[in-house]
Amino acid sequence: MAMMGTTICAVKRDGKIAIAGDGQVTMGENTIFKNSARKVRRIYNDKVVTGFAGSVADAFSLCERFEERLNQCNGSLERAAVSLAQDWRADKENMLIVSGTGEVIDPDDGICAIGSGGNYALAAARALMENTDLSAAEIAEKALRVAASICVFTNDHIIVEEV
């Protein structure tokens, strides 16, 4: 029984990084299993914000491993991500995507979005970044709302965390 469906959007603006995630967990292709899952959370003494999409078990496993690495690397986000990626094949200044296959991606424009509604959220966030003075948190939330209005695997129970 595969569980899927989520959208995570991260935005970096004016020295702040905000990550927003919806709360929907979908089982199979057509059943909403949960509406209020928490896929964005703070770790490392609330100094780092993470968001995850994909298989529930894989996502929790990846988050736990990442938090362990972050502690081992004394809070160095980049070292922890690279260390985890090398092992996995599986800070406030860095926003990184770590994929299940071990790639570590640092987006060029300070915006990234993943999951089933990721492309919608990414497009919305880029438009908002370019055409408004909204904060990182406001952009991330509004981008998620756009994705939720289009993608059936994304809902509008949105949690936003900012560092």
What kind of region is each of these model predictions?
Residues 1-92, 119-120, 129-134:
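Conserved short S/T/G-enriched processing/targeting/catalytic segments and their helical context
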Residues 2-9, 87, 91, 95, ...:
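C-terminal binding/interaction regions
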Residues 21-23, 29-32, 61-63, 97-102, ...:
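Short acidic, glycine/serine/threonine-rich loops at helix termini
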Residues 30, 38, 45-48, 103, ...:
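Short capping/connector residues at structural and topological boundaries
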